From Swiss-Prot:
Name the UniProt record assigns to this protein: Small ribosomal subunit protein uS19m
Annotated source species: Marchantia polymorpha
Annotated gene: RPS19
Compartments where located: Mitochondrion
MF annotations from Gene Ontology: RNA binding; structural constituent of ribosome
Gene Ontology CC annotation, any one: small ribosomal subunit
The keyword Ribonucleoprotein belongs to this UniProt entry's keyword annotation: yes
PROSITE patterns reported for this sequence: RIBOSOMAL_S19
């Protein structure tokens, strides 16, 4: 369900108080407004900060959409050896 239009976009009040060009943002739920275009933001993903330059295409989206909280899986790496070794079956005559 989307947010009601009469409420307007949610933006944390601390974002309006900052006057720097480079911001550190913990509020992933805040909407990106047109006045943020051209600024650099570092968005917290739960472990560290992810750098991002805000462009016009990002207006209306949330900050959290651009900082993934999950690790990417790497399918190309070799598998770990299993702990139990399979013993070969002896032939019976």
């Amino acid at each position: 369900m989307t947010r009601s239009i009469w409420k307007g976009p949610f933006v944390d009040t601390c974002l309006f108080k900052q006057k720097k060009i480079r911001w550190r943002i913990w509020s992933r739920r805040s909407c990106i407004l047109p006045q943020f275009v051209g600024c650099y933001a570092q968005i917290y993903n739960g472990k560290g900060f992810v750098g991002l330059k805000i462009t016009e295409e990002m207006v209306g989206h949330k900050f959290g959409e651009f900082a993934s909280t999950r690790k990417t899986s790497s399918l190309g790496k070799r598998a770990l050896p299993s702990k139990t070794k399979i013993k070969p079956i002896k032939k019976v005559r």
